[in-house]
């Protein structure tokens, strides 16, 4: 277990929990110091055994499980903080490890929280008793003897209050030591077991890809496989200053390149593969961008840059020291050593899911979860089955290409991504349908579409005051009657008086010549507005009097395409937001 330094207690006591960070408290029910120390040693040894036996191939997304034995407020215990990064599965893998270790050490009580608080209760929100929720669950949720338990208040208290207050750390430790009111819910534990049933097999999920990288990187990864995540994160969160290191590549230069298999996790591979970047100066990529060599070279370039950024980062001095220590261990792998590594490319089709397919996959997953939950309910919530049931290899571990080249995958993806004439017509049709649907919405409750009956006293008095001021300012001016329905009809061109009139008859005047009398009705106001708006549009679009529907569609698509091309990131900005809301996927290739 890693040492967290002398400030572990200060960080644990802090109310601020960083994003993607989980905190762990492990207390023991023994009252004698010698017995507690023995239980601590046994618990840490069991965690180490579990990781060696079940997670030997696991690659941590950010930090590995960090725990430290401390004496806190006169009580020997284990405290820990781990930042699991972007991989939520790492957090649940930690939960699985702690749950399994608690089975071996019966006196252990484990608490784990993150920025959401008691996230174990969030997972089992539908199964909680009425007297506990997220507001009063502090220090009440623990893992003990392989089960999630809740520190329950006294029955007399619940009869009076119907819900329990949150606990302090001291109160929770006292109740743990006494062993009283430990509430266990089969439904809560079933929900947690459902979430954990894919472990430990899911902990060893990996994705292998062929990359062209410096020989030094192969050597470093052979010494510590978890440095792959540090390098990918360094490239993924790079800034313009970091990219200056990539233009020099002083540590991982491109003079000694090898093509070999690199092991990622699916998440790390997706983060690296989908990162967009320029071709940095030290790199000479193949000219054929659709070739297999280009794919391997561009992936290797990104990984090499990640290691270069990691090595030069002032925030990761310990990583620099670690890399230097590995590189001092000679010799580097020879060409014969590299040839012994089998060239394997795992399936990456999981990244080629369009939005429509994603909804279908999520629905299938939800239905599968509901079926599993129903089976468990009918079987009496057999927790033993949950603990020992693992997700099949074919579900969790990406399979091999089976001889299929990356070129075929690239061609298939580009066929999905390129826009053609029918795609453009479909896009225009969806936008037109959306506008027509919005324009024809007659199901309104009032002018603003909402009822404003629930206004407070201050708002009412303010409104009355405004009305009085308005009336005083407009004394002597005739009241203008406002017909809301007629106003909407005028906006939509449905008013019989003007529906068949040619708009051209209003185009002769300009803004300076308009004279709206004080007693004008709403129709005259609308005529004046039409005249002003039409005159401005006519002057701006003088050469487009003969525009037809096809020209409108063409102009619409022209503006959309120009907006896409002007946006450096196709997955952000107003055009992308508009098209995504209409379920129109933007191609990666312009």
UniProtKB/Swiss-Prot annotation:
GO terms for molecular function: snRNP binding. It comes from the Eukaryota. The keyword RNA-binding does not apply. GO terms for cellular component: cytosol; nucleus. InterPro entries: Ecd (IPR010770). The keyword Cytoplasm applies. Keywords: Cytoplasm, Nucleus, Transcription, Transcription regulation. It is found in: Cytoplasm; Nucleus. Residues 455-464 have a biased composition (Acidic residues). Residues 445-464 are annotated as: Disordered. Pfam families: SGT1. One of its GO terms (biological process) is mRNA cis splicing, via spliceosome. Belongs to the ECD family. PANTHER family: PROTEIN ECDYSONELESS HOMOLOG, SGT1 PROTEIN HSGT1 SUPPRESSOR OF GCR2. Involved in the regulation of carbohydrate metabolism. May act as a transcription factor. This is Protein ecdysoneless homolog. It comes from Schizosaccharomyces pombe (strain 972 / ATCC 24843).
